[in-house]
UniProtKB/Swiss-Prot annotation:
Main location: periplasm
Keyword Nucleotide-binding part of the UniProt annotation: no
Induction description: During the interaction with the intracellular environment of host cells.
Gene: virB9
Protein name: Type IV secretion system protein virB9
Subunit annotation: Interacts with virB8, virB10, virB11 and the 15 kDa protein that is encoded within the VirB locus.
Keywords: Periplasm, Signal, Transport, Virulence
Record family assignment: Belongs to the TrbG/VirB9 family.
Location of the protein in the cell: Periplasm
Length: 288
């Protein structure tokens, strides 16, 4: 019975020791496939990266392109020479001495900072491939890569949506119903070859290499204002309809009047603001 209790007690002590004793381990960079002197490590601000330097050789640390080294602290400046340069740091061991540490702080373009912790070891011997030699240690940033991928996918999705909308717009612009009831008064030098609208946008077509004049929308109170527009070849698509537009180029002025203007932007054929919605009039109930 005493032997069993003693065994259980020793097992309990061993378990408590394993549970309460902290473990410390530095992160060793992973070797590149082609040459083990080139190494990679994922960034973690709470990991210590192990660096092994060889006498008569140097080690290059490479951080993200948007980082710049702003502070370097080293435990043993006698055994190691440190030279920061942009988002790089160059290390050169001078003599074999006990393990020391290196701390680096970088600033990013967005104003945030990153902190790096290193354990530095020095060894003598051959620096050829196959030995425990470090020439370049490049940091990787999985979270940044994931964010960049997410933003790129979002940008592609937005572009696809924009292309889809533009395709619909172009189809409606090219083949949809049009209002051609426009008149012009003023200088013939800046007169467009044609003007029409589809109930939402107004298209001005100019001949050949004609210098396109400025196009102003004239409000109901007579005020002129520039409006958003899209230029496609010799066409200027104004993103609005109006009772009157004024074209100006130098001293030349031309007024364009829409004889069928409807302030609500009614489609000239369907009677609504959408080519897919047909307006119907119900007689006898007081509504239409």
């Amino acid at each position: 019975m005493m032997r069993i209790l003693k065994t259980l007690f020793l097992a309990f002590i061993a378990a408590i020791s394993c549970y309460t004793t902290p473990s410390f381990a530095e992160t060793a960079p992973v070797s590149a496939r082609k040459d083990n002197r080139i190494r990679f490590v994922n960034y973690d601000p709470y990991n210590v990266t192990k660096i092994i330097g060889s006498i008569r050789s140097s080690v290059q640390l490479e951080f993200a392109d948007d980082e710049e080294v702003t502070y370097v602290g080293i435990g043993n400046s006698v055994a190691w020479q440190v030279a920061p340069a942009g988002h790089f740091v160059f290390l050169k061991p001078r003599e074999v001495q006990p393990v020391t540490n290196l701390q680096i702080v970088t600033s990013r373009q967005d104003g945030t900072k990153r902190s790096y912790q290193f354990e530095l070891q020095v060894r003598e011997g051959d620096v050829s491939a196959g030995n425990d030699t470090y020439f370049l240690v490049k940091f990787r940033y999985p979270e940044d890569e994931a964010l960049r991928k997410k933003l790129a996918e979002a940008a592609k999705a937005a572009q696809r949506e924009e292309n889809f909308v533009n395709d619909i717009f172009n189809t409606h612009e090219d083949f949809g119903p049009r209002n051609w009831a426009y008149e012009a008064q003023g200088s013939p030098l800046i007169e467009p070859a044609s003007v029409y609208d589809n109930g939402k946008t107004t298209t001005f077509t100019f001949l050949g290499n004609t210098e396109i004049p400025a196009i102003y929308l004239v409000s109901l109170d007579g005020q002129e204002a520039l409006v958003p527009k899209t230029i496609k070849g010799n066409k200027v698509i104004v993103h609005a309809t109006a009772a009157q537009f004024t074209l100006r180029r130098g001293n030349d002025v031309l007024c364009i009047f829409n004889k069928r203007f409807v302030p609500a932007g009614v489609n000239p054929e369907t009677g609504t603001t959408s080519p897919s919605v047909q307006r119907k009039v119900n007689i006898g109930n007081g509504y239409e």
